[in-house]
Amino acid sequence: MLTLDTLNVMLAVSEEGLIEEMIIALLASPQLAVFFEKFPRLKAAITDDVPRWREALRSRLKDARVPPELTEEVMCYQQSQLLSTPQFIVQLPQILDLLHRLNSPWAEQARQLVDANSTITSALHTLFLQRWRLSLIVQATTLNQQLLEEEREQLLSEVQERMTLSGQLEPILADNNTAAGRLWDMSAGQLKRGDYQLIVKYGEFLNEQPELKRLAEQLGRSREAKSIPRNDAQMETFRTMVREPATVPEQVDGLQQSDDILRLLPPELATLGITELEYEFYRRLVEKQLLTYRLHGESWREKVIERPVVHKDYDEQPRGPFIVCVDTSGSMGGFNEQCAKAFCLALMRIALAENRRCYIMLFSTEIVRYELSGPQGIEQAIRFLSQQFRGGTDLASCFRAIMERLQSREWFDADAVVISDFIAQRLPDDVTSKVKELQRVHQHRFHAVAMSAHGKPGIMRIFDHIWRFDTGMRSRLLRRWRR
């Protein structure tokens, strides 16, 4: 069967112009205009999706099939083009019957054209074919437009669903244009309103805990570039201007009490010659109580010192992926569970904004894995937030899973984050030694997010950074009171 793409080529119908008109009409629709005004960050993300829409529409037109009636009419037209005028005159009755049988829009006009001319000339033959071709072009264009209109309605419905989802999650997960673009890409999955409301719920909880949100931001920034002074720096001569009181003051600007003998007032000096007042003079001299002239003046001089040449090497700290291990034991239930999930949501927000990966592992009696920054990140986040914390604590398995992941090339610069109350058994010696080796040789960094003030120091000693967020009732009340 004839495809629409082939028909367009045969009749020289420009499908590109039709596609562009459809996309412009879609972007100018009132629904998108209101959305772009409300969420300007997502406007760029949706605009970046236009090439994908264009390619999908081309593919749809290319694969579309032409109706059998139109296919038969086109074949008849092609055969008629090959006929000479005498042959065309012989075949004309069959052609008119075929057009009538196919209910062609050209059938009635063709019969009127033939009836209006008693003799079929070469010019009439050419005119007949030209008008027939125009009729076929109109039919092909109409077919393209109908198909594109169906695609437009379907695409608009899909975009509206994704806009609803992205609009709900944008305040929670999109911190900049990069995050907005990745969020839009993730919204392509089949999600219902009730599903992503769980993310909205934990986003609202995170906003109610600004200290927790701030902790996640500090952890995310913990690999900023650092300047390191060199130890082998050479000495250099450094000259600077220093301001000092002048040895020869410029002017008298008042009186003051001091012990400056050279600037004594004459009455004070006269008391020194009176025997009865001599001791009084010395007492006031010791106490700096003598009246003296206050002189004003200052001078500048050049000071030359030797100091090391300051050169700094900037140690660019790569911001790699997050590998987050979350303790799902029974002691992490309740408020601890809410805080742990909200903290992971905050790390997901940072990962989206900085184009990083965020990989979650839940450790209990078994390990469950989620990647929150992948194409299915929203679905993965919903599954993670739906988990219940009711298992046991197996920190050793958690660390082994982290170390196995760090062996992979794509995770070599990852930051490992463990969220727990750290009320658990001590780690085996082989695990501890392996962690220290990764820290020393590969500069991997291990972060602890402690949800309790009673975590075991022996376990937490192996971490590079310990971020404390006590979830005890006293700490919660203090945080609320400070807010």
Swiss-Prot record:
The keyword Cytoplasm appears for this protein: yes
Region ranges (Flexible middle domain MD): 192-311
Region (N-terminal domain NTV) residue spans: 1-191
Matches recorded under InterPro entries: Uncharacterised_CoxE (IPR008912), Uncharacterised_ViaA (IPR023481), VWF_A (IPR002035), vWFA_dom_sf (IPR036465)
Chain intervals for the UniProt region annotation (VWA domain): 312-483
Membrane topology category: Peripheral membrane protein
SUPFAM superfamilies in UniProt: vWA-like
Inactivation phenotype: The double ravA-viaA deletion mutant shows increased persistence when grown in the presence of fumarate and kanamycin.
Key words of the record: Cell inner membrane, Cell membrane, Chaperone, Cytoplasm, Membrane
Coiled-coil positions: none
Effect upon mutating R476E: Abrogates interaction with lipids, contains slightly but statistically significantly fewer lipids and increases resistance to gentamicin under fumarate respiratory conditions
Subcellular location as annotated: Cytoplasm; Cell inner membrane
GO CC annotations on file: cytosol; membrane
SMART domains for this protein: VWA
Upregulation: Part of the ravA-viaA operon, which is under the direct control of sigma S in aerobically grown cells. In cells grown under oxygen-limiting conditions, expression is largely dependent on the anaerobic transcriptional regulator Fnr. The operon is coexpressed with multiple anaerobic respiratory genes, many of which are regulated by Fnr.
Principal location class: cytoplasm
Assembly mode: Homodimer. Interacts with RavA. Lipid-bound ViaA is still capable of interacting with RavA. Interacts with specific subunits of the NADH:ubiquinone oxidoreductase I complex (NDH-1 or Nuo complex), particularly with NuoA and NuoF under aerobic conditions, and with the fused NuoCD under anaerobic conditions. Interacts with uncomplexed FrdA, the flavin-containing subunit of the Frd complex, in oxygen-starved cells and the interaction is modulated by RavA.
NCBIfam families to which the protein is assigned, alphabetical: PRK10997.1 (NF008230)
UniProt free text on domains: A protomer can be divided into three domains: a highly alpha helical N-terminal domain (NTV), a flexible middle domain (MD) and a C-terminal VWA domain (CTV). The MD domain interacts with the triple-helical domain of RavA and increases its ATPase activity. Interacts with free FrdA through the C-terminal VWA domain. The C-terminus region also mediates interactions with phospholipids at the inner membrane.
Membership in a protein family: Belongs to the ViaA family.
Function: Component of the RavA-ViaA chaperone complex, which may act on the membrane to optimize the function of some of the respiratory chains. ViaA stimulates the ATPase activity of RavA.
Protein name: Regulatory protein ViaA
